[in-house]
A protein has these predicted regions:
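Catalytic loop of short-chain dehydrogenase/reductase
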Residues: 132, 144, 170-218, 229-231
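Substrate-binding pocket helix/loop in short-chain dehydrogenase/reductase
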Residues: 137-139, 146-148
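Rossmann-fold cofactor-recognition segment
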Residues: 88-107
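Conserved glycine-rich Rossmann-like NAD(P)H-binding loop of the short-chain dehydrogenase/reductase
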Residues: 65-81
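C-terminal helical subdomain
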Residues: 6-9, 13, 20, 225, ...
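Conserved NAD(P)H cofactor-binding loop of Rossmann-fold oxidoreductase domains
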Residues: 129-136
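Conserved glycine-rich cofactor-binding loop
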Residues: 49-50, 74
Length: 306
């Protein structure tokens, strides 16, 4: 990790919404805060066996979640990740379970939720983290098949997961909380200019959740999309990046930020998009909070200038 990634905050970039601009966890998003407690809850995290998803699972266990369910495509990796999470859990009663599920397969998602129903498992928090990073090609050179494959994972699978989550048969499990791990490529198209299918499909997913939030109260299902920032995951290393490529975020920053997003403190962000580097105390108060309350389009997918 670079030096910057090990600091709680660094000088804020000119384009950020808040100062400070965090690169590592800080007290306001600590899972040990009673206000962020996930005690007794079951949390489902797609793509939770490594990287950001694993950090999110760790943070929810630190927040006293009763059960973490992580999904992954590889049985061994998913099983081992769940075992490691359980062994390291700060909460003695907390446990993690690994379930093989390829979200690119609609039948696999149906089977996952049917399994929950059969065993009487109700999910309280859904974290949408699984993603398909499209090839580095212009849209018209990628081919319709490859672009649609990205839509299948990044949009169709997300909608299917949300529908099954929302329509669970277990009664009385409200409010539900949904955290969407998004990307700042949804509003800065130059960031992933070499992978336009990625930005396209992640934008579509964020917009879909934004529209769902229009018709769903946060008291029923709270929805927040977050940008996890730059984290040096194994996938990033596989793409050729190393510790010197960026001032990387600590993976614990998006991990703990996801817990905050699933708490009542984040209810005012229902249907909106936020960066995990932004300071939550600053967002909760002052001019930023005032604009959120007055502007229904602020921090949402849309057209600038209108």
């Amino acid at each position: 990790m670079s030096t910057a990634s090990n600091q709680s905050n660094v000088p804020a970039p000119a384009w950020t919404l808040t100062t400070p601009f965090h690169k590592a966890p800080y007290p306001a998003i600590s899972p040990s805060r009673l206000e962020l407690s996930q005690a007794g809850k079951t949390v489902l995290i797609t793509g939770g066996n490594a990287g950001i998803g694993y950090a999110i699972a760790t943070a929810f266990l630190e927040a006293s979640a009763a059960k973490i369910i992580i999904t992954g495509r590889r049985e061994g990796a998913t099983r081992d990740a769940a075992a490691s999470l359980t062994a390291a859990a700060a909460n003695p009663g907390g446990k993690a379970v690994g379930v093989v599920c390829d979200v690119g397969d609609a039948l696999a998602i149906d089977a996952l939720w049917k399994g929950f129903e059969k065993e009487g498992t109700g999910v309280d928090v859904l974290v949408l983290n699984a993603v398909k990073v499209a090839d580095a090609k212009p849209l018209l050179e990628s081919g319709l098949g490859d672009v649609w494959s990205a839509f299948d994972v990044n949009v169709r699978a997300q909608l299917q997961m949300v529908e099954r989550f929302y329509k669970q048969k277990q009664e009385g499990r409200v409010p539900k909380n949904l955290v969407n791990v998004s990307t700042f490529a949804i509003h800065n198209h130059l960031v992933a200019a070499d992978r336009p299918a990625y930005g396209l499909t992640k934008s579509a997913a964020a917009l879909a959740l934004q529209l769902i939030a229009q018709d769903t109260s946060p008291e029923t299902m709270q929805i927040v999309s977050m940008n996890p920032g730059a984290v040096l995951t194994e996938a990033a290393k596989g793409a050729g990046y190393d510790e010197e490529s960026f001032a990387w975020n600590s993976p614990d920053l998006p991990g703990r930020f996801a817990v905050w997003c699933a708490s009542p403190e984040a209810a005012f962000l229902h249907g909106r998009f936020i960066w995990c580097e932004w300071d939550v105390d600053e967002i909760k108060s002052g001019e930023i909070r005032k604009r959120i309350e007055e502007d229904p389009f602020y921090l949402k997918v849309g057209v600038r200038g209108l």
